[in-house]
A protein has these predicted regions:
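Secretory targeting and sorting signals
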Residues: 1-14
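Non-catalytic cap/lid and distal C-terminal segments of serine-dependent acyl enzymes
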Residues: 12-266
Length: 266
């Protein structure tokens, strides 16, 4: 069990980034994590027109394999999308999840617990976000992680989104290093958790999108099919493109509209 009192956000290491062209502020903070036994960065984007402390919605966004907390900070589409959301724009926390953690508790570290018990509570306290208005999303590996954490922590999130999420039907199909073995996969089998389970995402709005040339398309189609059969509150999209940065950059404005609207209504 994590000794929460011993886990803290290293505010002394906080760096205040310059205001970007769209008025948002980027703050880089460091979490000294007991869950994964290392220091990790969290990049936090504060929109220009944020709400008062205690009322601010929070989007936790998980990067893909090989990424970091700074993966999306240089993406103009993120800031353009936030500006268009006005007062509904959420604060976005981009935690560093390592190269191939797949955002779940495993032998090399409790990466899911790091997000749930360390990153989210500390960001809530530091930035004054509303603990009842939290969404989680991610791209590729991060999309898998967002679904997994939302399923394992029911009623914690208002909304969850997977953007080209890295999903599989069986443990033997997974990418090298994604899981510790079949037992680890079975504990975090996102597709299996929603199959025939209409309450899997109970109370959450769910988003899924992927490109028509995405190698994960068949798995995402299966996942979406289960959600539709079970009557989930689902927004699902198949767009032109592959599993790459150009595809995701084109759709950041749509992603942010989904999260902002879901957080405003939860």
């Amino acid at each position: 069990m994590i000794a929460t009192a011993a886990v803290y956000l290293a505010l002394s290491a906080t760096l205040f980034g310059p205001v970007d062209a769209h008025g948002a502020r980027v703050e880089h903070v460091t979490v000294r994590s007991q869950a994964v036994d290392r220091e990790l960065g969290v990049s936090v984007v504060v929109p220009a027109r944020t709400k008062p402390r205690g009322e601010r919605p929070l989007l936790v966004f998980l990067h893909g394999r090989g990424g970091s907390d700074e993966t999306f900070i240089g993406n103009e589409a993120v800031f353009e999308g936030l500006e268009k959301m006005g007062r509904k724009a959420p604060i976005i926390a981009f935690p560093d999840g390592g190269d191939h953690s797949y955002w779940h508790d495993r032998r090399e570290g409790d990466w899911g617990s790091y997000v749930m018990r360390e990153v989210i509570p500390q960001v809530e306290r530091r930035f004054g976000t509303d603990p009842h208005r939290v969404a989680i999303g991610g791209i590729s590996m991060g999309g898998f992680g967002a679904y997994d954490l939302a399923l394992l922590h029911p009623h914690r999130f208002c909304a969850v989104g997977g953007h080209s999420p890295a999903l599989w039907f069986e443990g033997g199909e997974t990418a090298p290093g994604a899981f510790d073995g079949v037992a680890d996969f079975n504990r975090n089998d996102v597709v299996g958790m929603v199959r025939g389970n209409p309450d899997a995402f109970d109370g959450m709005r769910v988003w899924n999108d992927y490109g028509d040339a995405d190698p994960f398309r068949v798995y995402d189609e299966g996942f979406v099919g289960h959600l539709r059969a079970d009557g989930a509150d689902l927004s699902a999209h198949t767009w032109s493109g592959g599993h790459d940065g150009a595809y995701w950059t084109r759709h950041w404005p749509a992603y942010l509209r989904f999260y902002a609207n879901a957080l405003a209504s939860c």
